[in-house]
């Protein structure tokens, strides 16, 4: 199994990683060491001899304790990798063992084939037998290309030679060293070094792990160290010759290292035997390494995606929040947005709402609920009424229906509480309004905050009345008076003028109590007498509903509105005349401070209103 794993690893790593790294590093290290081996270059001839011994030797290494002797052969070729291995004596050796063999093979081919060809053949041979390679090297050195094929044969023989491993007499072991010289030939590896560089890093990372395992080899060191060292030294010399052929300089240095390292390497032989194990471990490392990189990349992306997609969406959402943020003024509206569904129900009220503003906010609202049906028509009429407002006569008729409706408005008070929702709803209702709401909302927040609800409906109507607004312009000021009391002040005068126009209403002046009339207007019928006072109590809630104060103000504006309608129906204008002083009040009312005040004035009126209400009601 390990062999198979080694094969796979060796094949892969060999092709580029191990061979390249070992060749590159070994060559570099050899650069400093092989010189001595160069001296023993003659051994190449011995190499030819050594091949036989090498086979025997190598099998021993694999087959038996020969590990010590094996170590020598190993040293022979590992030394080249020694440069590498020293750091990782244990693990790399196996690879190096393989690599060196590859070098052994490569040395002849290395110049040309070593990089491209050797890797393939190496894949198989190295795994088969590090030592096997050595012998094969020794045998094959003459025929580089053959070296590759023979290696396999060599491998097989080594296995078969395991018994020969017994032969592996010390002399063969020495010969085995000569095969290492063949490894020394690895000098060609220098050529490899280029390709090695390709995957050196990959190979490197894995080797360390392998090294760890090799450590066990130390025991073998004990046995091998001494003989291996000696053998190594001579082998190194022999190696040098091969090295010389390809790159004596580079390889020469390695030999010295080999000598010192041989001891270190001695363990590698066992490591070699173990090498399969290491290689298994090793094999995992490479995979692990390769996967880790991708996984990191992937892992980040997913997070990035999950965050970024969500984040991105979040940003996208965040923008909406800004968009909503404008609504924030809408603060209620947002909720109401959700309610919008219900808004449908409200939707009628919203239209109704639009009318409600005119009638008169405080009581009429209550009566307004029923108006919804009538109101629904009124809204249309309302939109015209705005223009007709000036045409006070028409509005009255239109309003008259609202009046009946108003009686039922009592529920609306609750609706009023919803007004905030309605507020949001108004936007839905009037698409055009939707934009205004924001604009509106800003002003409302300051002073309008309460009015907004009630006002919001009017705005819808307003939006519709835009044309009338021109005519309305005076009332509009009245409407906006809350914020622009200055403008409002003019409206009051206008109101006063209106009263003059209403001079006929003077009889309605009798309704002076009706100043609440605006309220009574609707209330008078049902809401009227008692409700009106109670209605006032509800208005307090409206007061609580900040909107009510605006209501009062709206009333005031409404009067302006209503005045047109009221002329026929309401003596509201007369009350306004009476309120002429209040008109200033109303002006102040716009200021908010008067907000609170306005409620009380209505209250004051309320007392009178009740009796008149009763009378009025009785009259109807």
UniProtKB/Swiss-Prot annotation:
Sequence repeat start and end residues: 229-235, 236-242
Compartment list: Secreted, Primary cell wall
Region of interest called 3 X approximate tandem repeats, as start-end residue ranges on this chain: 499-600
Native source organism of the sequence: Nicotiana tabacum (Common tobacco)
Annotated GO biological process: cell wall organization
Residue numbers spanned by region 2 X 7 AA tandem repeats of T-H-R-H-A-P-P: 229-242
Function: Has a specialized structural function, possibly in the mechanical penetration of the cortex and epidermis of the main root.
Bias (Pro residues) ranges: 34-45, 106-129, 178-219, 251-552, 562-613
Protein name: Extensin
Cysteine pairs bridged by disulfides in the record: none
Keyword Repeat listed: yes
Signal peptide as annotated in the record: 1-20
């Amino acid at each position: 199994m390990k062999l198979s794993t080694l094969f796979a690893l060796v094949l892969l790593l060999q092709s580029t990683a191990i061979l390249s790294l070992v060749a590159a590093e070994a060559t570099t290290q050899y650069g400093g060491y092989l010189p001595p081996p160069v001296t023993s270059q003659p051994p190449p001839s011995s190499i030819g001899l050594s091949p036989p011994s090498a086979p025997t030797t190598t099998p021993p290494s694999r087959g038996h304790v020969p590990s010590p002797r094996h170590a020598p052969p190993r040293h022979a070729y590992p030394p080249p990798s020694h440069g590498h291995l020293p750091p990782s004596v244990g693990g790399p050796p196996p690879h190096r063992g393989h690599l060196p063999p590859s070098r052994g093979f490569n040395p002849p081919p290395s110049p040309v084939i070593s990089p491209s060809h050797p890797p393939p053949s190496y894949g198989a041979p190295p795994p088969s037998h590090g030592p096997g390679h050595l012998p094969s090297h020794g045998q094959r050195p003459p025929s580089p290309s053959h070296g590759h094929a023979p290696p396999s044969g060599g491998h097989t023989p080594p296995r078969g030679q395991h018994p020969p491993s017994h032969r592996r007499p010390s002399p063969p072991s020495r010969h085995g060293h000569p095969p290492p010289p063949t490894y020394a030939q690895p000098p060609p590896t220098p050529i490899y070094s280029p390709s090695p560089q390709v995957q050196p890093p990959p190979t490197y990372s894995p080797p360390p792990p392998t090294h760890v395992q090799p450590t066990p080899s130390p025991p073998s060191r004990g046995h091998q160290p001494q003989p291996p060292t000696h053998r190594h030294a001579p082998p190194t010399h022999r190696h040098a010759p091969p090295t010389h052929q390809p790159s004596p300089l580079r390889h020469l240095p390695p030999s010295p290292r080999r000598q010192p390292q041989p001891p270190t390497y001695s363990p590698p032989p066992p490591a070699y035997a173990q090498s399969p194990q290491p290689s298994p471990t090793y094999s995992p490392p490479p995979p692990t390494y390769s996967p880790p990189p991708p996984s990191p990349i992937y892992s980040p992306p997913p997070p990035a995606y999950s965050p970024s997609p969500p984040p991105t969406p979040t940003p996208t959402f965040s923008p909406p929040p800004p968009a909503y943020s404008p609504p924030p003024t809408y603060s209620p509206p947002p909720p109401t947005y959700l309610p919008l569904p219900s808004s449908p129900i409200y939707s009628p009220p919203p239209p109704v709402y639009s009318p409600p503003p005119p009638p008169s906010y405080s009581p009429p609202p209550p009566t307004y609920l029923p108006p919804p049906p009538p109101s629904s028509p009124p809204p249309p009429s309302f939109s015209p009424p705005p223009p007709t407002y000036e045409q006070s006569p028409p509005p009255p008729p239109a309003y008259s229906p609202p009046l009946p409706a108003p009686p039922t408005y009592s529920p609306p008070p609750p609706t009023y509480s919803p007004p905030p929702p309605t507020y949001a709803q108004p936007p839905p209702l009037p698409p055009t309004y939707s934009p205004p709401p924001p604009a509106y909302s800003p002003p409302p927040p300051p002073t309008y905050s309460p009015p907004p609800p009630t006002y919001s409906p009017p705005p819808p109507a307003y939006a519709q009345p835009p044309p009338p607004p021109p005519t309305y312009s005076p009332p509009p000021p009245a409407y906006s008076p809350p914020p622009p009391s200055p403008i409002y002040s003019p409206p009051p005068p206008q109101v006063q003028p209106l009263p003059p126009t209403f001079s006929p209403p003077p009889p309605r002046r009798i309704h002076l109590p009706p100043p609440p009339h605006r309220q009574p207007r609707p209330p008078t019928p049902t809401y009227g007498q008692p409700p009106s006072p109670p209605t006032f109590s509800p208005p307090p809630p409206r007061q609580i509903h900040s909107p009510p104060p605006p209501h009062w103000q709206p009333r005031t504006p409404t009067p302006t509105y209503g005045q047109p309608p009221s002329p026929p129906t309401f003596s509201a204008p007369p009350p306004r005349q009476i309120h002429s002083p209040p008109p200033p009040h109303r002006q102040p009312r716009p200021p908010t401070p008067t907000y609170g005040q306005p409620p009380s004035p209505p209250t004051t009126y309320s007392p009178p209103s009740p009796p008149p209400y009763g009378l009025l009601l009785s009259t109807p």
